[in-house]
């Protein structure tokens, strides 16, 4: 067996969404900060293509690269690679990374609770892991500051007419639309249609509304979050959502950055206040338990500090290799399973 490279991976999913973790075989990319390192990964694309494209990956897969932290407060850094983006932050991926770090012994587990500080490209995140019998059973992550950008903005979408949307940042950038406006329900049988419509809405929002982070070089809207109405029971709000990820797939989890974004919009509209909780439910029925911890300011904008809580499970280990005679060193994409991102 011969190979010009061997990449060691621990497989993982958080509430249904794949978030595999590279634990060896890749040197840290160049960059003075984790953000700069993530920009190198995004622009170079060599590693992204190798691990995400067929025959080694697929549109369903997200992969995280562990890197030494740049911030002295952090114990580990990580860079997130999604099908079309290399984002600042991801809730499900941070839960996967935390679980792999503890379950594999890379960071020592303390029962019943382990506290960690990790460094995502978008900033420092604080992690609290509930642990028992050698397993990280639930991960709570303090996400980066989240804020609403545009509220109730009109958006013209081909085939849908004019719809009203919100744009918001929850660790990544979203356009949010109510499912009823587009004549859809969030259920597994409509996954393909939801994904395709969501990508179309994202494209229209980038063309007509745009987005710019006040502190990061992040100048586009990444995702469309499709929501159903929120219900309230005391100080707990519950809402079903699904996020369309380019090129056209649905997040299987409730989307941690999406839940953070939704809480930011609810707060901006006066429908949620500090200390209240939000349960986000996915298209699979899995849940993230979240809290609007406090209100703050980011770059002159009102913002919130959200906490996301969910579970993840290790699914296996693997080694990705490249035989020198392989005709597809960068992999390939076919539109039968990798929809065209138009």
Curated annotation (Swiss-Prot):
Record GO terms (molecular function): 4-hydroxyproline epimerase activity; trans-L-3-hydroxyproline dehydratase activity
Pfam families reported in the protein's UniProt record: Pro_racemase
Cross-referenced SUPFAM superfamilies: Diaminopimelate epimerase-like
Protein name from the UniProt record: Uncharacterized protein BCAN_A0346
Assigned protein family: Belongs to the proline racemase family.
Native source organism of the sequence: Brucella canis (strain ATCC 23365 / NCTC 10854 / RM-666)
């Amino acid at each position: 067996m011969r190979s010009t490279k061997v990449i060691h991976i621990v497989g993982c999913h958080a509430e249904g969404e794949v978030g595999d973790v590279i634990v060896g075989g890749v040197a840290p990319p160049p960059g003075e900060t984790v953000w700069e390192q993530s920009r190198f990964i995004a622009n170079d694309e060599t590693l992204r293509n190798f691990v995400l494209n067929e025959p080694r990956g697929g549109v369903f897969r997200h992969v995280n690269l562990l890197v030494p932290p740049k911030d002295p407060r952090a114990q580990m850094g990580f860079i997130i690679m999604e099908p079309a983006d290399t984002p600042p932050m991801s809730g499900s991926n941070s839960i996967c990374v935390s679980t792999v770090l503890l379950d594999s012994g890379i960071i020592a587990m303390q029962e019943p609770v382990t506290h960690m500080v990790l460094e995502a490209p978008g900033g420092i995140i604080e992690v609290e892991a509930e642990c028992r019998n050698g397993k990280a059973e639930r991960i709570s992550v303090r996400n980066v500051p989240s804020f609403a950008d545009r509220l109730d903005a009109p958006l013209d979408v081909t085939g849908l007419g004019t719809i009203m949307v919100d744009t918001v940042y929850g660790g990544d950038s979203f356009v949010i639309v109510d499912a009823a406006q587009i004549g859809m329900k969030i259920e597994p049988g409509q996954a393909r249609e939801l994904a395709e419509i969501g990508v179309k809405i994202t494209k229209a929002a980038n063309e007509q509304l745009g987005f710019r982070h006040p502190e990061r070089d992040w100048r586009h809207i990444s995702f469309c979050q499709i929501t159903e109405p929120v219900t309230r029971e005391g100080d707990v709000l519950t809402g079903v959502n699904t996020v369309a990820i380019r090129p056209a797939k649905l997040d299987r989890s409730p989307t941690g950055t999406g839940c953070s974004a939704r809480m930011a919009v609810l707060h901006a509209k006066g429908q949620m206040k500090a200390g209240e909780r939000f349960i986000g439910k996915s298209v699979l029925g899995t849940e993230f338990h979240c809290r609007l911890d406090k209100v703050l300011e980011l770059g002159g904008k009102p913002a919130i500090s959200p906490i996301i809580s969910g579970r993840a499970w290790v699914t296996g280990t693997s080694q990705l290799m490249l035989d020198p005679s392989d005709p597809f060193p960068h992999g390939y994409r076919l539109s039968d399973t990798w929809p065209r991102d138009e």
